[in-house]
Amino acid sequence: MAIRSDRALGRAEALLLLGALGALVAINLPELGSDPWPFRAPPAEPRGLLAPLVRATGGGWEPGLLRAAATLAGVVTALAAAAVLVAGRLWRSAAVVVAAVVVALLVLPGVLLQVGLRGGTAPWFHDNDSTYQIDIAGELVRDGETPYGYDYRFSGLERFYSFDGSVSRQTRNAQVALRHFAYFPGTPLSAAAWGAVPQPFDDYRILVALVTVAALPAALLFRGPLGARLALGAALAASPLAVRAAWFGTADAPAVLALVVAFALVVRSRLTGAAAALAVAILLKQFAVVAAPFLAVALARRASPRALRRAGVTFAAVLAAGFLPFVIADAGALIADTVVYGGATYRIIGYGLAGVLLEAGVIEDRFGPYPFTALALLVWLPLTALLVRAQTRSGETWTAAAGFAASVLVLFFIGRVFQTSYLVWPLAAALLAGLLFLSERRGSGRSARATTASATVSGATHADGHAARGRA
């Protein structure tokens, strides 16, 4: 019996997808779960729904469990490939299920183990200081307080930095992070909402893991061949950077997902929704601001003046709804924590220009002055303007994501801090450019077919008219 092509992937498309999934497994597996924080914690007590995981690892961090799950993901991929080789096709529903299983097996086990270990010891163990602080910020919001300008020196967070749960006066006085909360308001607001989830799943990393996995179905919002969309979506959700971010505790995934949704809504001409999604992305992470001019140009190319005004009002309204409560509470603390802290107060970290200058002796102190503002004005801003101009000239939406990838990478490089986890942003933007390219190619193909069909019908009608006149 013949199989309709819209119900199954052909052999080549299916094997391309499965090859991409296999590559993700192979890239992730050797380093999965490596280089955690060096906690000197007591063995975790098995508690609650995650007790089996804690028992399986003897109450400690065990990368072998994560790698076993990744190996299982590889086996699932291999079995699916064998089925394709035998049958010559892969049902579309089966392709979605296989991709989802592989992504889940790569992303979720590490997060669940970390949360189980944390619940069996103390909140300052088996977590990252940033997500621990986000959890605390969510509690403050639920209690009607602002997390900006708050003194975290006696919140429990101070016990994280010794890695054994102890605390010293020096830590409380010297650790700058205990006096600042660096995230835009969307993060504490989302943490406040997520904190209502029953324990132990109220850990913010569970939310991060879920939205990380959600990048896979988000890729299906774009148009194009299913196999290619699933491959790019799986890379968005389960790249080594995204997988590590989920269990280690860096909270970029919610903002990245919102940005992916924003671009998907642009290509679907849901312009008001795209503007709202961009605003949500910015509320969740400052880095999304860099995408604003690129997405604005993409919106302007598709919108009437009235629709563009409506999108602008929606964007401003969503931002205002997120920022205003904290501006009213303490505008100075909000600015000091989210803008000044990252640009001028935080110590120099990482492999960017600041780190290179520090190692070369040009900068003497990690806390010393660094001309970030001048570099941003002289280097990053002109480059971004050129990229936006190139996007405007090209008329193709995928160049917006490509331009954003280049712009944000340069911004990271010239900043005081260049964490490797930041690379998830240019990587996601590059994959997003691929999804946008597929969407535009599919759209142009449909337009060409429609034009050809219209011309054919018009030609046939014209010929019939001549024939009728000839008979007359």
Language model: regions and residue ranges:
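Primarily membrane-embedded glycan-assembly and transfer machineries that use lipid-linked glycans
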Residues: 2-96, 105-263, 299-420, 433-434, ...
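A periodicity- and composition-biased signal for non-globular, repetitive helical segments
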Residues: 211, 291, 422-425, 452-455
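Transmembrane alpha-helices of multi-pass inner-membrane enzymes
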Residues: 423-441
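Membrane-interface transmembrane helices that cradle and orient dolichyl/undecaprenyl
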Residues: 259-273
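Generic transmembrane alpha-helix motif of multi-pass integral membrane proteins
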Residues: 261-263, 278, 294, 411-412, ...
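Short, intrinsically disordered terminal tails adjacent to the first/last structured region
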Residues: 1-11, 440-472
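Transmembrane helices and adjacent periplasmic/lumenal helix-loop junctions
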Residues: 272, 276-300, 321, 416-422
